[in-house]
Amino acid sequence: MPFLLHVYIYQLICVFYTDIHVYTHIYIYTYVRRDILNGGSSFNNLIFQFLVPFQFLLLYISEDIRHSSRVYFLRLDIWHTIPRGSRTVFYVLFLKVWIGQSSYVYWGIGSFITINIVPWRPQQPGQIEQA
């Protein structure tokens, strides 16, 4: 199982947004962005376009009383680093989960379900990856 998938599962398990959780978001974002700028892979393109923006949204709307002031400014910095195209995906996924949730379900599970119903096909052998 790819390393980033392990990290994403860890994100789903985490209920409390601690400093480690915040820094993991930053690490995933910088790692995937660097990988894509260097050519990237289909798996990392999927994470960059869907998983990472939505996870940042979860981080942005979550309340962490212990770190509220420090994390608040960190969230603003993160928000401005997300490309415009990913911000659009951000809003769409947020609305899909928000409208689709009729009970108190942990947001991580909601995001996982939403992300997995987004149409996406792995790259076929020999197919040229489009920018």
Curated annotation (Swiss-Prot):
Give the location in the cell. Answer: Membrane
Predominant location category: membrane
Q: What is the protein named?
A: Putative uncharacterized protein YLR101C
Cellular component per GO, a single term: membrane
Also noted in the record is:
Partially overlaps ERG27.
| Recorded topology in the membrane | Multi-pass membrane protein
Signal sequence bounds: none
Give the UniProt keywords, A-Z.
Membrane, Transmembrane, Transmembrane helix
Q: Does the keyword Isomerase apply?
A: no
Segments crossing the lipid bilayer:
3-23, 41-61, 98-118
Protein's organism: Saccharomyces cerevisiae (strain ATCC 204508 / S288c) (Baker's yeast)
